[in-house]
A protein has these predicted regions:
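Feature captures the catalytic ectodomains and active-site-proximal regions of enzymes
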Residues: 1-179
Length: 179
């Protein structure tokens, strides 16, 4: 299994798009991931996909699943590549750590249904199911002693998340693994 580091959505989603080079750009204290110089955030993913193949489309699962069959079919008609983003697990992780486990079960059922739609309605034959990143969860919360306090970064961090910290190039904190 390969994964981009850190294993968070903005890096993982960008890595799944066609590109020659991924870069991180810090603007106004906000870190963005670019594919060949283009933003990979949200609806920009469709633009990046179309740069590689104009007969492509990027869609959200939650949007297409509520559509009628004819509406869905019209969106993908004539397309050579269709990306469908599904975020049941990610959405659950932002609201409750314990809901992630049931969200995994829900996601499997939803993706199985989506494959049925792709095969039966879109006549899809090549289906690739992948994930933008992994996750580690336990039913037991982490002890405070297992966590790194953000205040020890002393203005060195570019971005700090629940599972990662991105530091300025050349930073050498003794409590983090450089990647």
């Amino acid at each position: 299994c390969e994964a981009i580091f850190p294993t968070v959505t903005k890096f993982g989603m960008a890595s799944l798009l066609p590109h020659k080079k991924l870069t991180a750009e810090l603007k106004n204290n906000r870190l963005s991931i670019l594919a060949d110089g283009h933003s990979t955030e949200s609806t920009n993913r469709d633009n990046v996909l179309k740069q590689s193949n104009p007969e492509s489309v990027a869609l959200q699962y939650k949007n297409i699943i509520g559509m009628k069959r004819a509406e869905r079919s019209a969106l993908v008609k004539g397309k050579e590549v269709v990306y469908i983003y599904h975020d049941t697990i990610d959405a659950a992780s932002h609201t409750s750590d314990t809901m992630v486990f049931s969200a995994c079960e829900d996601a499997i059922a939803e993706i199985k249904n989506l494959v049925r739609i792709i095969v039966n309605e879109f006549s899809g034959v090549n289906i690739i199911i992948t994930a933008d990143h992994g996750f580690l969860y336990t039913y037991t919360p982490l002890a405070e002693t297992d966590k790194v306090d953000k205040t020890i970064f002393n203005q060195q961090d570019v971005e700090y998340g629940r599972r990662y910290a991105i530091m300025e190039r050349g930073s050498k904190p003794d409590y983090l693994l450089p990647v």
